[in-house]
Structures are given as structure tokens and as C-alpha cells.
A protein has these predicted regions:
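Walker A/P-loop-proximal flanking segment of P-loop NTPase domains
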Residues: 90-143, 149-157, 163-168
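Substrate-engagement module of ASCE P-loop NTPases
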Residues: 233-235, 265-285
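Structural recognition of the conserved hydrophobic beta-strand(s) that form the central parallel beta-sheet
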Residues: 245-247, 272, 285-292
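Amphipathic alpha-helical segments of the small helical/lid subdomains adjacent to P-loop NTPase cores
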Residues: 299-303, 310-378
Length: 404
């Protein structure tokens, strides 16, 4: 802590080293603080004296923890939120709860909602899909929010109504039925041999067999029969139709796309696993499949001819990613914080974000869609850089380049 002076013009702060290095943590006059446009979300604790607090309240409106007692503005008469005197000229303000939390790397809807993270409401799309369709396929690039959307559907069909309070889906759905949900994340099955892939699928089925039981007469590697029995047993036990969510269905095949000898047997394993879906129609409430490739390109769902591909439908162009109106209206506060950190206007921040991250169009005359991973990282770090490419080499593009 800095030692306060008797003057009324000083603010004393401790914060991260990014804006003020440790050697410069000292008395900061109003001129310095506003020249550098320090945002109060960057402040962990503040020691403020006298009239300067009133000026800050008028300037920022963020000091809701302190109130002057009896209309006096002298530091010795400040009291904290519970009405107790601070007995001195150093009232302490905890600003940690003011900082926005960004869901970097978090792909679970429940964790984002319960953790109070920044969230752009996509639940209206979820409720609409659940109402209009039974079998849905969505193709989007990597790091584009497919897994979060899948998780949101999982919570929706699990009847977790409390997670959707205040969100669009709560206005559209009055019947929160709890369905048995089978959620398969195939991103965990990358870079595997045929035997490893079968075992990986088997482990995923083990999880649901712990809840709904297994049939010892079915061979462990007969994943087709195990999936079929699981769905039928879940419907029998719960009395409600089942939901199947397959996230990144094509992940096991991406690294063998240019090797036909390896691709064919791996594709056959996946085709065999997914094949019961069509015959299970009487037992299914909803099926949702995501991937990078169109399902027709890999011929895995050739038997599932009732799959609705919404990937290039205009009304779902913003189902993943962030649209321009969402950025300007729902992410207004993060944009403002970034502008203050970079010492530029909000319009300039929007211009830079647009130039770097909104190059996606998923149908004719599509609105501009921002890559959510890059955009959220930029708002969190308050800087412009190539976040998407830094996460790893885009394998499929690399393979295409090699094959050419």
C-alpha cells in the first residue's frame, strides 16, 4: 500500500503489472489517471480521500460500495456499505467483482451460466430447433462454438430450466421435459487406430450403461447393438423419448482424409456405430450432429436420409459465432473496456475487430459472422492478434496442401 497524503486529490491503487509496473505503483494524480484512461475494472483495491471520490463517482458511477455520511465530503466521515464508519481517510473498495469474466476454453453451458461468464444468448436458436425439427446437422469451422451449442442443447433437453432463466429460451418454452440425453463428443477419438477407435466408442457407451444397464449377451466391441439397446432401455425406464447429440462426428477421420487405405475402415466403424439411428426413430425426440465436413462428403450418414442440414440456411447463419448486432449490443461493455485500455474510441475498436475476425459468411447474402474464439480472446486480452491460428495447425487444410 502507498502511504496517503493529507491532500484530497490522490488515488492509491494496487493492480496487475500490465498497466503500471511495480516500480511505478505510487500516488497517481487525477491528471495522470485520466490521461492514461485507467478503467476501474482494472483496480483491485483503491484508497481514496475526500472530494476526489465524489469526482470519481460522478465520472464513472462505479463506486457503489461507499457513501458519504451526512452529506459531508471529508474523508474521516466516509462509511462503508453496511453503514459503519471507516474511521479514517482510507476507505477500501474491492473492485474484483466488477471485472468481466470471459469463458476462455469453457464449452459447457452450465459452467458458463453458473460461473457468471460473458455469454451471447443463443438459446432462442436452441428452442426453435427443438420445436421445428427432429434430425439436424450443422457444419462449422473449428473453434466456432459447436461444442457450446451441443452442450446448450444437452441442458435444454435435460430439463434444466433454471439455467435458462432470463434467456430467450425461457420465453419460448413452457414445457421443460426431462429426456434421456446421449451426448457423444468424438473430438476425443482423434489420431487413433481402428482398434483404439472401437475401444473409445465403447468407453463412451460404458458411461451410459452405468445408468441404464448393459446386456452381457452383446459383445463389447459390438457398439452398434450396444447403442441400440441403450436407447430402447432408456426410453423404457424414463418413459420419455431419447435425445442423441454427436459433437464433431468427423473428428476421428480428419487425419486420415488423404489416406484412402486408412480412411475406408475407419469410416466403416463410424458408419456402423451411427447406423441404428434411423431404425430408432420411434424412440427418438431429437438428433443433433455437428462437424467440420458436410456429412455427404464422408458418406457416414447415407442411411439417415431425413437429416436436415441447417449449415447454410440464412436464419441460422448466426447460430454459432457472433453477429455484428450481437457484438455492438450484447458485448458493449467489453468493447468499451477494450477501447479504454487501447486509448481509442469504441468505434475504432469495432473497426479493428471487424477487420480481423468477421470474415465468415455461411450463405448467400449472409450477415458478417465473427469467429467467437478469436473475438472473446481479443476482448479478454484487450489486444488484436491471430488467436485462432495460435491454437494449432488446421490439420485438414494442411493435408489438402500436402495432397496437392
Amino acid at each position: 500500500w502507498s502511504t496517503p497524503s493529507r491532500g484530497l486529490e490522490n488515488i492509491f491503487i494496487t493492480r496487475s503489472d500490465t498497466l503500471f509496473p511495480r516500480r511505478n505503483r505510487s500516488t497517481i494524480t487525477p491528471t495522470r489517471i485520466f490521461t492514461r484512461r485507467l478503467h476501474l475494472a482494472d483496480v483491485r483495491f483503491a484508497c481514496i480521500s475526500g472530494d476526489f471520490l465524489l469526482y470519481l463517482e460522478a465520472r464513472f458511477g462505479r463506486f457503489d460500495k461507499l457513501r458519504p455520511e451526512g452529506g459531508s465530503a471529508t474523508g474521516s466521515e466516509f462509511c462503508n456499505q453496511d453503514g459503519k464508519r471507516t474511521n479514517g481517510v482510507i476507505p477500501i473498495i474491492d473492485m474484483a467483482e466488477k471485472a468481466l469474466k470471459y469463458p476462455i476454453g469453457i464449452q459447457t453451458f452450465k459452467d458458463i451460466v453458473e460461473g457468471g461468464y460473458v455469454y451471447v444468448d443463443k438459446t432462442g436458436f436452441v428452442a426453435e430447433l427443438a420445436d421445428k425439427y427432429r434430425y439436424v446437422f450443422l457444419s462449422r469451422p473449428r473453434r466456432f462454438g459447436k461444442s457450446l451449442l451441443s452442450s446448450t442443447l444437452h441442458s435444454y433437453f435435460s430439463g434444466e430450466e433454471e439455467l435458462f432463466r432470463g434467456l430467450k429460451a425461457s420465453e419460448m418454452n413452457s414445457d421443460w421435459m426431462r429426456h434421456p440425453v446421449f451426448h457423444f463428443d468424438m473430438s476425443t477419438a482423434k489420431h487413433m487406430t481402428e482398434l483404439q477407435l472401437i475401444r473409445n466408442i465403447g468407453y463412451k457407451l460404458d458411461f451410459y450403461e452405468e445408468e441404464y444397464g448393459n446386456d452381457t449377451r452383446i459383445a463389447r466391441d459390438d457398439v452398434n447393438a450396444r447403442l441400440e439397446r441403450l436407447i430402447m432401455e432408456a426410453v423404457r425406464k424414463t418413459g420419455e423419448k431419447a435425445v442423441i447429440i454427436i459433437d464433431e462426428y468427423d473428428a476421428p477421420l480428419l487425419d486420415v482424409m488423404n489416406d484412402r487405405e486408412k480412411l475406408l475402415p475407419m469410416r466403416q466403424i463410424m458408419r456402423n456405430f451411427y447406423s441404428p439411428i434411423k431404425s430408432l426413430d420411434p424412440y427418438l425426440r431429437f438428433v443433433f450432429i455437428t462437424g467440420i465436413n458436410k456429412f455427404a462428403q464422408l458418406s457416414i450418414f447415407s442411411e439417415l436420409n431425413n437429416l436436415k442440414n441447417i449449415s447454410m440456411m440464412p436464419e441460422y447463419s448466426a447460430i454459432c459465432g457472433i453477429s455484428q448486432p450481437e457484438l455492438e449490443n450484447r458485448l458493449k461493455e467489453p468493447v468499451q473496456e477494450m477501447a479504454e485500455r487501447l486509448l481509442v474510441s469504441c468505434d475504432e475498436v469495432l473497426r479493428q475487430l471487424k477487420r480481423n475476425y468477421d470474415g465468415y459468411h455461411f450463405c448467400a447474402n449472409s450477415e458478417d459472422i465473427y469467429n467467437p474464439y478469436s473475438l472473446i480472446n481479443a476482448l479478454s486480452d484487450k489486444e488484436i492478434k491471430n488467436f485462432w491460428f495460435d491454437t494449432g495447425t488446421p490439420t485438414y487444410l494442411s493435408l489438402i496442401h500436402i495432397s496437392e
